Swiss-Prot record:
Gene Ontology cellular-component annotations: nucleus; SCF ubiquitin ligase complex
Presence of the UniProt keyword Nucleus in the record: yes
Function: Involved in ubiquitination and subsequent proteasomal degradation of target proteins. Together with CUL1, RBX1 and a F-box protein, it forms a SCF E3 ubiquitin ligase complex. The functional specificity of this complex depends on the type of F-box protein. In the SCF complex, it serves as an adapter that links the F-box protein to CUL1.
Family per record: Belongs to the SKP1 family.
Gene designation per UniProt: ASK13
Protein name per the record: SKP1-like protein 13
Protein source organism: Arabidopsis thaliana
Domain of life: Eukaryota
Pathway info: Protein modification; protein ubiquitination
Renumbered residue ranges of the record's region Interaction with the F-box domain of F-box proteins: 96-154
Summary of subunit composition and partner proteins: Part of a SCF (SKP1-cullin-F-box) protein ligase complex. Interacts with ADO3/FKF1, EBF1, PP2A13, SKIP15, SKIP16, CPR1/CPR30, At1g55000, At3g61590, At1g67340, At1g78100, At3g04660, At4g38940, At4g39550 and At5g49610.
Keyword Glycoprotein: no
Cross-referenced Pfam families: Skp1 (PF01466), Skp1_POZ (PF03931)
Keywords: Nucleus, Ubl conjugation pathway
Length: 154
């Protein structure tokens, strides 16, 4: 039987996961190495809803001893569907913040690539709307920036 680790979200939810799942987070892996998990691992900046998504990703990505090309392709397909679901449920950025906080590089990279794909080919106004960023430049300041960076608009 594999060793279990208790993860405690910021809003008080607890999740019992296998150590192989938990150690995909470098942050948690270091806590396990330092023997700091006896009373559970508090994940201060991550709610239960988001932590459950992170755990779902980590469970799917527990490395098998001999992954086949077929299993790699299936995982890529699963990743794409997972990211699409996060995007549609408006939890993508929260999951990315959690991945960064927990140091889960592959999940953070996947999230960053998803955001890059989302903004590719979009105009600044569209990107601001998509990411919820307020434009705090005056029209004059925008024009000045366009002139200074003309090469980027060619």
């Amino acid at each position: 039987m594999s060793k279990m680790v208790m993860l405690l979200s910021s809003d008080g939810e607890s999740f019992q996961v296998e150590e192989a799942v938990a150690v995909q987070s470098q942050t948690i892996a270091h806590m396990i190495e330092d023997d700091c998990v006896a009373n559970g691992v508090p994940i201060a900046n991550v709610t239960g809803v988001i932590l459950s998504k992170v755990i779902e990703y980590c469970k799917k990505h527990v490395v098998s001893d001999s992954p086949t090309e077929e299993s790699k392709d299936e995982l890529k397909k699963w990743d794409a569907e997972f990211m699409k679901a996060l995007e549609q449920s408006s939890t993508l950025f929260d999951v990315m913040l959690a991945a960064n906080y927990l140091n889960i590089k592959d999940l953070l990279d996947l999230g960053c690539q998803t955001v890059a794909d989302m903004i590719t080919g979009k105009k600044p106004d569209e990107i601001r709307a998509l990411l919820g960023i307020e434009n705090d430049f005056t029209p004059e300041e925008e024009e000045e920036i366009r002139k200074e960076n003309q090469w980027a608009f060619e």
